[in-house]
């Protein structure tokens, strides 16, 4: 065969391509197309193993946080339950003492007056100042001028009560009623544990005890 015929045959072979090469090309295209196809559609409610954590990380975190918060609240309530029942204040101590000692003199003394004034301040916040705020508020808000006026009114009232108490202690240093009730409460403090007395009485508890005491006295 001449060299010219050989060259023509070789060119024709390159243009057509070998059967093996064409088969490899089709196989690669088929494989590449399958790898890029979407995953099969699942029925409603079905998810992949990792889809939930990818699509709902916020809801998952919120549920965990809410659970921890609820557990902490329950632990706090459990740890504090029972303590409030053991705590006392002058109102409760004096009312119990008077119940067993009807001949006791009228209320007086440092513990009585200091607790009474603290009760008056709490009562002013929950009742008088609340009503005044509701009269002045616009969209449940008041300005600084009105706020200052409310605070000064309360200060003026409490200042007068403290001045009256100081005047009494200065001019009646030998008040029998003061000595009696202060001694009652000192003896009470000597009989209770330091752990119980370290627990502070809340304003709500003080107000509730005072109201109960006044109701008992009126009856």
UniProtKB/Swiss-Prot annotation:
Amino acid composition bias (Basic residues), ranges on this chain = 24-41
**Superkingdom of the source?**
Viruses
What is seen without this gene? Answer: Abolishes viral capsid-encoding mRNAs in the host cytoplasm with concomitant loss of expression of the capsid proteins.
Spans annotated as Disordered: 1-90
The annotated regions of Basic and acidic residues compositional bias extend over: 74-87
Q: Does the keyword Methyltransferase apply?
A: no
Q: Where in the cell is it found?
A: Host nucleus
Specify where the region named Nuclear localization signal lies, as residue ranges.
7-50
Q: Does the keyword Nucleotidyltransferase apply?
A: no
Q: Please list the residue ranges that the record marks as compositionally biased, kind Polar residues.
A: 60-73
Q: Which GO terms describe its cellular component?
A: host cell nucleus
Keywords assigned: Activator, Host nucleus, Transcription, Transcription regulation
The record's Pfam families line, in alphabetical order, gives: NP1-WLL
Query: Its family?
Result: Belongs to the Bocaparvovirus Non-structural protein NP-1 family.
Q: What does this protein do?
A: Required for the expression of the capsid proteins. Performs the splicing and internal polyadenylation of the viral capsid-encoding mRNA precursor, which allows its maturation and expression. Transactivates the viral promoter.
The protein's name in its UniProt record:
Non-structural protein NP-1
């Amino acid at each position: 065969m001449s060299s010219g015929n050989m060259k023509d045959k070789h060119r024709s072979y390159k243009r057509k391509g070998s059967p093996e090469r064409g088969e490899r090309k089709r196989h690669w295209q088929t494989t590449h197309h399958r790898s890029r196809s979407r995953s099969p559609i699942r029925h409603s409610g079905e998810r992949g193993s990792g889809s939930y954590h990818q699509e709902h990380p916020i809801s998952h975190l919120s549920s965990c946080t809410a659970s921890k918060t609820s557990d902490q609240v329950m632990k706090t309530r459990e740890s504090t339950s029972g303590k409030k029942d053991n705590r006392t204040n002058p109102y409760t101590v004096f009312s119990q003492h008077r119940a067993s000692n009807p001949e006791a003199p009228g209320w007086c003394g440092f513990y009585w007056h200091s607790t009474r004034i603290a009760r008056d301040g709490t009562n002013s916040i929950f009742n008088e100042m609340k009503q005044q705020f509701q009269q002045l508020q616009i969209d449940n808000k008041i300005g600084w001028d009105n706020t200052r006026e409310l605070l000064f009114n309360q200060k003026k009232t409490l200042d007068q009560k403290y001045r009256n108490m100081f005047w009494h202690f200065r001019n009646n240093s030998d008040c029998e009623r003061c000595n009696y009730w202060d001694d009652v409460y000192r003896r009470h403090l000597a009989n209770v544990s330091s752990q119980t007395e370290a627990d502070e009485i809340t304003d709500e508890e003080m107000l509730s005890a005072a109201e109960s005491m006044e109701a008992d006295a009126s009856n």
